[in-house]
Amino acid sequence: MTVIPNVVSEMPIPVMLAVIVVLVGLPIIFIKDALTRSKGAMPAPTDVRKAGKGNEWDKLNKHHTPKLRGSRKALATDVHARLLAPSFPYALCHGNPVDALAVSEPSSTKEMLSRDWEVTNRLELLRQLYWLLQEGHRKDFGHTREQCGNPSWVKNRLARVNEVADEQTDAWEERWRIHRFLNNDRGINDVDFGAWDFIRAAMLIRAGAALGFITDEEAWDTLAIINHALHMSYSSWDEAWDAFRLTRWLWAAKGQAQEAENDLHDRNRGEFLIGKNGLWTAIPWDLPSPTSRFLLLDVLATEGGLHLLSPSGWEDASAWEREFDTQTRTRAPMSIGGKPIVH
């Protein structure tokens, strides 16, 4: 019984102080980690700490901590939260309440729409949404991926872009993407790019509704379209997230340093979405969502803004794109190939 007191009495004061600090600090660390996890975050993984990126991870935890007006548990039964789910990735980055059709900073949201999307009014927003739902970036990425299976095209195209890649950003990025497809980096040749377009469309809907460019009714209805598109394209939140982050990587087309920074960002963001306490984890993938009336198409029909897939486009289209085109045809004028709605 006297062993411990004897050891303590013989312990040098600096060592004793260090032991006390450890004994006091460990519970604090455990409590801090528990609180962090309860918010959907995860303490920096071992490999991140070893790489000297622990501080960056901690900053990302603060950046991505979700703003909830309700509880995380309520997400599973909240119809509106289910509709808003595709907008969560950008809500985390923008500091918006994930479970409400609102933004935290209207002025910066307005600036973002104008700067990044050239959207300053209702019609411009509707046209951007229509483009994302009908074809988006996935059309060009899919075309490039297909062409990369043709050695002759690859040789000629690389010869052209190599001439200007050092001076033109677009050419440099195209060359970068061609090599990614040729090497099948990150399994990019098997990725369905749709999530990249659908999730960005959900972000635009939140922003547009908050700024009054579209009505709440139009916003909820178009979010229902996006949820349906995701369900037709993927089998789980995990699969949708992987498709989004990989297509975002392809779109960004950055050098190694920036690529590593983006990877860390999305790894952290993914913890808040599909981690053990993630927002998407709280919402069952197969939870039913309201059926859309495709109000977006009704509005654009009055503006002459509808376009139909060509026969060749139809052949290459996904199941979702064909359904969207069918809905478009029932509203488009006969002069461009539309047909009257059949009841």
Where is each model-derived feature located?
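Short, strongly hydrophobic alpha-helical membrane anchors
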Residues: 1-11
